[in-house]
Amino acid sequence: MGKPIVAIVGRPNVGKSTLFNKLAGKRISIVQDTPGVTRDRVYAEAEWLRYNFTMIDTGGIEPENNDIIIKQMRRQANIAIETADVIIFIVDGKEGLTAADNEVATMLRKSKKPVVLVVNKVDNLKDENNAYEFYNLGIGDPMAISAGQGLGLGDMLDEVVKHFDKSIYDEEDDEYIRIAMIGKPNVGKSSLINKLLGEERVIVSDIPGTTRDSIDSHLETEEGKFILVDTAGLRRKSKVKEEIERYSVIRTYAAIERADVCILMIDATEGITEQDEKIIGYAHELRKAIMVIVNKWDLVEKDDKTLDKFKKDLQSNLKFLSYAEYLFISALTGQRTNKVLKLARYCYDNYNKRISTGILNDVISKAVLMKEPPIVGIKRMKIYYATQVATKPPKFVFFINDESARHFSYERYLENQLRDSFDFKGTGIQIEYRQRKE
């Protein structure tokens, strides 16, 4: 399972973005070579009391018309209810209670999701009385904060983490491998899942997932136990396309966050699109295990070079996914669908792989002997030792002499040496460099 998801909901100009940015701190980062992923910063990683969680800003555009605001608030509340484990409902202590606040509070009450009600813009003790009228919303005790000044945020976060399912932080492995099928509507995600379930005929149950557009299907096979998550995406028509796009991204991101293996499905008759690159970019950022499946391969006119050319074109567009596994199938005819779960299991095993410290350091020592680090300025990086500190994804820490002696091309060389030596095909890996004295 992924980290808990916390969604921030509120009217325009109540301080959602201020709170989001204050909590995220410096944890929002733009990853190079990942097109369009973090430019619209709808999510960020955060931590409180050693609990890591993901924050989602349901904001979007900021209309001025009151009717549009209420419609937007309904959408925000829906997306929070569907994707989040805990909801922060932020209201404006200076402006007071509004019709839109009441509307959303009603939806949140019905959802039964944990809600933390925060009254923002309470910048001093004199303004604390402004919070009391929000008891009328009927969703618990209002907590007075000032997002701009950082006042009251600790108490608010204490309340948020109280609602987390602490069992997800246990080290024990989940017995199910979670696979998220991601991609545009109508590329064949549901068809493939139905094919896999139909062939195996050992469905445990169909359980409504965290969003109205996701269905979690439990499946047991010779390859292991799987949960297949079909992310249908938003299909509602709306004039506010940017807003709908944002909510679609949030839904998809929530599915990716909770997955072990992410399968990007592409329509062979359309090829890859910018939206595909953006979607799989999230999985790459989180260093998930990744497969790219090209569906409807039966509809493509082929010769003996077609598959190789198509794959090379894909890899050219997805340069940041050099480690991903590729598979060409037809969910309709069943062509190569029998290989999907085998390949997913292979990617997952690499995602969950652990390397002993002794063997790891032997490989790094040999890599340095074959090609020593370049001199950066007047210093050359020296690696004292390396160790693996986590799996899912594999995370390594290299202890070095000087941070300023690092060079991106040599770091890429070391990552390639790890991948070649230990077979991390199909999964992202993370390498952290820490300076220490000799």
Curated annotation (Swiss-Prot):
GO biological process, one term: ribosome biogenesis
Chain residues that bind GTP 2: 183-190, 230-234, 295-298
Keyword flag Repeat: yes
Start and end residues of each KH-like domain: 353-437
Domain EngA-type G: 4-168, 177-352
GO molecular function: ATP hydrolysis activity; GTP binding; ribosome binding
Binding site for GTP 1: 10-17, 57-61, 120-123
The UniProt record lists the keyword Cytoplasm: no
Chain segments annotated as coiled-coil in the UniProt record: none
PANTHER family attached to this UniProt entry: GTPASE DER
Family: Belongs to the TRAFAC class TrmE-Era-EngA-EngB-Septin-like GTPase superfamily. EngA (Der) GTPase family.
Oligomeric and partner information: Associates with the 50S ribosomal subunit.
Role played: GTPase that plays an essential role in the late steps of ribosome biogenesis.
Official protein name in the record: GTPase Der
Organism from which the protein derives: Clostridium beijerinckii (strain ATCC 51743 / NCIMB 8052) (Clostridium acetobutylicum)
Lineage: Bacteria, Bacillati, Bacillota, Clostridia, Eubacteriales
